[in-house]
């Protein structure tokens, strides 16, 4: 297996313009495909997940052109639901941001489409979304294991009164919200359980509004969507920088700054993961906000005990930042780590122990006490981009760290290690 050993880093300084947000990129691509008119998407993320969405849209007859660096996409919308030319199978890798929204959108009209993916995708639950779509008339079969992909979709979604479980993944609600305006009937969506990752729903609502559709949101417990609507292209749309990707650089600034400045997000960003900067501030770093940037300056870091449900992806970065904080850090209400690219609670606990930390892994929390001195270890990444990027921070000590399968960062940030090296001064 390929590996990358990062030597100790004495200081991290400088600015980075962030690649586009994965969450925003794939939502914007799907809405542009469903919309009337031509959309120009700028700062689109060039990554595995986005390629899977683009390949799927192409197979569904959507025409687009990409710039040489794949960050500008000119896409001609279908002006309504997507239709397969015949029976079709779409391979979506491990891209949850493609699988969930497409599973809903392709239930409009009459299609026969199979959605499948990598082995890990077949372990990521989708039953709650399928249950909700069936309530709205969709005809869906499981082809292997009940409640998991692959799925066969045969259209039939008309809207109506629908319940969705919000406790596992906000992507299920996102998928329903984006599909409902194109259904022939009005849709009322009621959310059962505690809605996880609520800020991601705000991204969805914000983007739908950009494409000309507004819906009634009653305290995130009930959403009323008028049927028979159309999305309309906003013309040009700039994809924000990825706030989850910003977390590694901001944390590096907190641990070994200098000052690190990330551009492409700022105080006006629609992504909830910008709140990661508040957590670093609480730990002792100095944060400066601009409209289009966030800067972090080193501080003496101390442990925190916090509910992280609002920033589940960026919270992983706090788990490795905790190795540099005084005291025991506890991250709570993070059960949905278990249904991501890998079981991230198990993976994080396992790899933190390798570098010498004392770790308690709970059902929905993790407690981390740093060692007096970090140990060199080979870090398993579980084909999870965030594991690789989180554990790169171990090199901000006087100990090297070896990252196995470093190219897994291609899911969201293909040149992550080059960018980190560019801003680093070796010890």
Curated annotation (Swiss-Prot):
Keywords: Amino-acid biosynthesis, Aromatic amino acid biosynthesis, Cytoplasm, Transferase. Disulfide bonds: none annotated. One of its GO terms (molecular function) is 3-phosphoshikimate 1-carboxyvinyltransferase activity. Phosphoenolpyruvate binds at residues 22, 96, 124, 171, 344, 386, 411. GO terms for cellular component: cytoplasm. PROSITE patterns: EPSP_SYNTHASE_1, EPSP_SYNTHASE_2. Its EC number is 2.5.1.19. The active site is at 313 (proton acceptor). Coiled coil: none annotated. It catalyses: 3-phosphoshikimate + phosphoenolpyruvate = 5-O-(1-carboxyvinyl)-3-phosphoshikimate + phosphate. The keyword rRNA-binding does not apply. Pathway: Metabolic intermediate biosynthesis; chorismate biosynthesis; chorismate from D-erythrose 4-phosphate and phosphoenolpyruvate: step 6/7. 3-phosphoshikimate binds at residues 22-23, 27, 169-171, 197, 313, 336, 340. InterPro entries: Enolpyruvate_Tfrase_dom, Enolpyruvate_Tfrase_sf, EPSP_synthase, EPSP_synthase_CS, RNA3'P_cycl/enolpyr_Trfase_a/b. One of its GO terms (biological process) is amino acid biosynthetic process. It is found in: Cytoplasm. It comes from the Bacteria. Belongs to the EPSP synthase family. Catalyzes the transfer of the enolpyruvyl moiety of phosphoenolpyruvate (PEP) to the 5-hydroxyl of shikimate-3-phosphate (S3P) to produce enolpyruvyl shikimate-3-phosphate and inorganic phosphate. Monomer. This is 3-phosphoshikimate 1-carboxyvinyltransferase. It comes from Salmonella agona (strain SL483).
């Amino acid at each position: 297996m390929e590996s990358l050993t990062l030597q100790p880093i004495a200081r991290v300084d400088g600015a980075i313009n962030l690649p586009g947000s994965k969450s925003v990129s794939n939502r914007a691509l799907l809405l542009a495909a469903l919309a009337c008119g031509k959309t120009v998407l700028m700062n689109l993320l060039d990554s595995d997940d986005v390629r899977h969405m683009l390949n799927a849209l192409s197979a569904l007859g959507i025409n687009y052109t990409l710039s040489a660096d794949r960050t500008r996409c000119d896409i001609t919308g279908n002006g309504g639901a997507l239709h397969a030319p015949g029976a079709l199978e779409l391979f979506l890798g491990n891209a949850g941001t493609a699988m969930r929204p497409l599973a809903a959108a392709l239930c409009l009209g009459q299609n026969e489409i199979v959605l499948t993916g990598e082995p890990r995708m077949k372990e990521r639950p989708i039953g709650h979304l399928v249950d909700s779509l069936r309530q709205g008339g969709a005809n869906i079969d499981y082809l292997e294991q009940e409640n998991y992909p692959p799925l066969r979709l045969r259209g039939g979604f008309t809207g109506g009164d629908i319940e969705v479980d919000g406790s596992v993944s906000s992507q299920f609600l996102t998928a329903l919200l984006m599909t409902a305006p194109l259904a022939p009937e009005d849709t009322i969506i009621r959310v059962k359980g505690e809605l996880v990752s609520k800020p991601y729903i705000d991204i969805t609502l914000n983007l739908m509004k950009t494409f000309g559709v507004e819906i009634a949101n009653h305290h995130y417990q009930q959403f009323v969507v008028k049927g028979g609507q159309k999305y309309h292209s906003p013309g040009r749309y700039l994809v924000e920088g990825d706030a989850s990707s910003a977390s590694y650089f901001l944390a590096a600034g907190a641990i070994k700054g200098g000052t690190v400045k990330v551009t492409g997000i700022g105080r006006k960003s629609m992504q909830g993961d910008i709140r990661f900067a508040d957590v670093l501030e609480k730990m002792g770093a100095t944060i400066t906000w601009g409209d289009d940037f966030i800067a972090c300056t080193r501080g003496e870091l101390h442990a925190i005990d916090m509910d992280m449900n609002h920033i589940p992806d960026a919270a992983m970065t706090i788990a490795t930042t905790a190795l540099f904080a005084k005291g025991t850090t506890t991250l709570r209400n993070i059960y949905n780590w278990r249904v991501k690219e890998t079981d991230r609670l198990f993976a994080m606990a396992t790899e933190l122990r390798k570098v010498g930390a004392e770790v308690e892994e709970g059902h929905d929390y993790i407690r981390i006490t740093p060692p007096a001195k970090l140990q060199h270890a080979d870090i398993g990444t579980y084909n999870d981009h965030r594991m690789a990027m989180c554990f790169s921070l171990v090199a901000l000590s006087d100990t090297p760290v070896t990252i196995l399968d470093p190219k897994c960062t291609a899911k969201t940030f293909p040149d992550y290690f080059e960018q980190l090296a560019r801003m680093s001064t070796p010890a």
